[in-house]
Swiss-Prot record:
One of its GO terms (cellular component) is cytosol. This is UPF0149 protein YgfB. The gene is ygfB. It comes from Salmonella typhimurium (strain LT2 / SGSC1412 / ATCC 700720). SUPFAM superfamilies: YgfB-like. The lineage of its organism: Bacteria, Pseudomonadati, Pseudomonadota, Gammaproteobacteria, Enterobacterales. NCBIfam families: PRK01736.1, ygfB_yecA. Pfam families: UPF0149 (PF03695). Belongs to the UPF0149 family.
């Protein structure tokens, strides 16, 4: 079962966002929500934060709010399931060009970094493998292409980049949401 089956369809979500005048694509909204979850926001504060970032602090209408709750729940569930079900929410289908998908990916990554940044304000201080992945995501967010490029080659490259971004998001989730075990000698003594 894929995450796409648990959330509203991409076109349906796009319609809800357009009706509300949200100014974000479904990919960007999913990137933002994914970034907040991967950054460690796992309580109900995600909704007011999302409203602040995307709708001048105002709540969304019922249809969009319900669709976003489904998106948040499905994304959270997919990430908690060791990430096996987590997929980027990008447009698909015969009518979607590789260039549209590349643009959607860049938007997803930009908004993922925004969501991650608001939940992890010291993101620039992260080191190691996660720090490198975040730096790579910053570069991917500036993804560009030449429309004269071979579309088949670009599609193959894009699929590799999408998989890399997916794994980088899982790494961020693991880094910022998993409790680090404390060695017994480091734990504070319990007073009786």
């Amino acid at each position: 079962m894929s995450i796409q089956n648990e959330m509203p369809g991409y076109n349906e979500m796009n319609r809800f966002l357009n009706q509300q005048g949200a100014g974000l694509t479904p990919a960007e909204m999913h990137g933002l929500i994914s970034g907040m979850i991967c950054g460690g926001n796992n309580d109900s504060s995600w909704q007011p934060l999302l409203h602040d970032l995307t709708n001048e602090g105002l709540a969304f209408g019922h249809e969009l709010a319900q669709a976003l709750r489904k998106m948040h729940a499905a994304t959270s569930d997919a990430l908690e399931d060791d990430g096996f079900l987590f997929q980027l929410y990008l447009p698909e289908g015969d009518d979607v060009s590789v260039f549209d998908r590349a643009d959607a990916l860049a938007g997803w990554v930009n908004h993922f970094l925004l969501g991650l940044g608001v939940t992890q304000p010291k993101l620039d201080k992260v080191t190691g493998e996660t720090g490198e992945a975040i730096d790579d995501l910053r570069n991917i967010a500036q993804l560009g292409y030449d429309e004269s490029e071979d579309q088949e080659e670009l599609e193959m490259s894009l699929e590799e980049i999408i998989e890399y971004v997916r794994v980088a998001a899982l790494l961020c989730h693991d880094t910022f949401t998993r409790q680090q075990p404390t060695a017994p000698e480091v734990r504070k003594p319990t007073l009786h």
